[in-house]
């Protein structure tokens, strides 16, 4: 089995929305969350997707 799509990281302002399984980053503000998501997108060579107002996921396609 070859995984082609997977979640690299989760970035959120609401720690109650995250459980284990991948790298999680808890931010204090929406602006900080967007900044962290943008940087992780570049660092991890992934794509950031917003899931509502409180969460981004970085995925590898």
Regions found by a protein language model. Name each.
Residues 1-46:
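N-terminal non-globular leader segments, chiefly Sec-dependent signal peptides
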């Amino acid at each position: 089995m070859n995984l082609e799509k997977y979640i690299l990281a989760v970035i959120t302002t609401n720690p109650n929305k995250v459980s284990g399984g991948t790298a999680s980053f808890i931010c204090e503000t929406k602006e900080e969350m967007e900044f962290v998501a943008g940087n992780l997108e570049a660092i991890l060579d992934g794509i950031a997707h917003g899931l509502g107002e409180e969460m981004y996921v970085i995925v590898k396609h």
